[in-house]
Amino acid sequence: MGKKGSWFSAIKRVFTPHSKEKQLSNNNQEPEIKSENKEKKKKGFGKKLRNGETNSFLPIFRQPSSIEKILSEAEREHNLVFRPPTPTDRANSSSTSVASPLVRPASPKVPSQRYVSSPKPISPRVAYPQVHYPKPPSPKPPSPRAVSPRIVQRREFVHRPEPSLLVKNAYAIKIQAAFRGYMARRSFRALKGLVRLQGVVRGHSVKRQTMNAMKYMQLLVRVQTQVQSRRIQMLENRARNDKDDTKLVSSRMSDDWDDSVLTKEEKDVRLHRKIDAMIKRERSMAYAYSHQLWKNSPKSAQDIRTSGFPLWWNWVDRQKNQNQPFRLTPTRPSLSPQPQSSNQNHFRLNNSFDTSTPNSSKSTFVTPSRPIHTPQPYSSSVSRYSRGGGRATQDSPFKDDDSLTSCPPFSAPSYMAPTVSAKAKLRANSNPKERMDRTPVSTNEKRRSSFPLGSFKWNKGSLFMSNNSNNKGPGSSSSGAVVLEKHKTLKSVGNLSIDSTVSMPATIGRRAFNRFA
């Protein structure tokens, strides 16, 4: 691939005439031009391109630098030293060349550019051109090329004196100044760019961008940590679930061999059905049991007791018998049943069930001889806390299910009974309203106490009739019955009406009694 010339050289080539004479003259001058081109190629100046252009160091649209100026001056001086011959010299040389054989002059060595531009002193071997004198003619016959009428031009060289020390110093100073100026300009340009870059970096916009970038980086790191922690948690949960599944499978495999042809899904469906059936069965049993407790006779009031009495009976007796003198020797409960008339059905409450005497789980309470029928609606009823439903009567009224409502360990032994001073302190610390209400009542009618221990929303309660309650018959409802229904008030005739935890269903636990509520 050759180099392309400029448009000016192309136009010049078009308008240049190409005649035969010019071609002949060009053919004659070809060896000289070739020799000159070789010398110029060696020196590196004026190299011609393909289309006749010269390769100059000076650009077209740029002012030459100091180094280029120095090099151009050196080239100009070299051109002055190398002067072409005059026409007279050409004629003389042509005559001598025809008369005498061809003598080829030796071209003197011209000092190169580096020796001219360098501040070092030029050696005399390089500075002075060597002149070769013509050799004597050889005895050989002349060659046909020498006899030919070709004209050989002879060149003359002018002796160049050696530059003085001042000239060398001036050249060295110029070169050093040019080089130092170039280095200074380059360093100044770099420093100028650095200062501009620092000004941009230290500006407010760059600081704001940096702060935003740091915030985004912090947010990104936070999101990445959250995602990583969530993934780790998911992996831990999955591993835990897999571990539980393997344990479940191993526990199932440890059982007997399963010969069924059912799939795992069918087995799971059947298992869920069994569980649902068990839950429904328990609910239905609880519902039926609660209704059974509601419909039972009030006979269970004398059965569900600790040693024949409820848990709160000791506190009731203590409130009733505060006016009575304290006995150091506790009385024993009477095991003989009270006489029962045809139109009266009551229970005698003895003083033996105070906190000073321990309750015995083996004590019995004789039930009435005649069965008590279920009362009519809107009459008092006490539910029995037993599953038997009154089918069979036993000598001991304490049933197996009585442990749900009676707790014998809560009764205090005799040596832990409160003394007179302790009772006085308890009475002093009690509520003043209760002390004011404790007014003495007449002997024929005792004070009535009502303690809503149970839940009224179940419409159930327990009734304990006193000596003054009037019952016309076992099957007839009394006028002083306690009716615990929704949106109804508590009615009672006599000296005692207590709603106990016996009336609560099996699904609801007992609540502790709060005397200050």
Curated annotation (Swiss-Prot):
Keywords carried by this UniProt record: Calmodulin-binding, Cell membrane, Cytoplasm, Cytoskeleton, Membrane, Repeat
Segments of skewed composition (Low complexity): 328-342
Entry keyword Repeat: yes
Bias (Basic and acidic residues) ranges: 432-448
Keyword Cytoplasm: yes
Organism expressing this protein natively: Arabidopsis thaliana (Mouse-ear cress)
Protein name: Protein IQ-DOMAIN 13
Principal subcellular localisation of the protein: membrane
